[in-house]
UniProtKB/Swiss-Prot annotation:
Membrane topology, from the record: Multi-pass membrane protein
GO biological process: phospholipid biosynthetic process
Species the sequence originates in: Aromatoleum aromaticum (strain DSM 19018 / LMG 30748 / EbN1) (Azoarcus sp. (strain EbN1))
Residues passing through the membrane, by range: 1-21, 78-98, 112-132, 155-175
Annotated compartments: Cell inner membrane
Keyword Calcium: no
Record keyword ATP-binding present: no
Name this protein carries in UniProt: Glycerol-3-phosphate acyltransferase
Subunit note: Probably interacts with PlsX.
Pathway: Lipid metabolism; phospholipid metabolism
Family in the record: Belongs to the PlsY family.
Amino acid sequence: MNFLLLLLAAYALGSTPFAIVSSRLFGLADPRRYGSGNPGATNVLRSGNKAAALLTLVGDCAKGWLAVWGAAKLGFSPVEAALAGLAAFLGHVFSVFLRFRGGKGVATALGVLAGINAWVALSALFVWLAVAVLTRYSSAAALAAAVITPISGAVLLGATPTVAVLALIAGILVWRHAPNIRKLMNGSESKIGASKS
């Protein structure tokens, strides 16, 4: 397969809006119209339907992982597989199916990390869980996980181009959370489990 075609396929895969799909399957409102307005698992959870939120989480993680795994299976190099993961991540954030206004990309990024290196993914997940439990803020947990990712990547993978891809994903995650950072600073950020109103 041509590398450009791989990137396009990974982007299309990443663009699949599982938050919208799962909400329709469970007869829920469009998650872009309540809570934070973000089409992601945390916002779907605000609907009160944990099954829909779980399906969203699994779907968003899976598409990131599948992009990396599929690229590796097709014989592409580790950095090319990581770039396929980046394409899937960008597909989620700038979904062609949602007029290029997708989600924050946290779950998809975790899937990409899992495809690249399980230990890097586990370190990010551990940090996310720890901060989420301590603060009850999904955004704070995501920011902390984003910061640790290129660090753990450098430790575990060395100075490789793949780590640069991880750093780029982390930077985009922080940028996508800019409104949440402002809300955290002024005390208006919603906590995990808050209602959708």
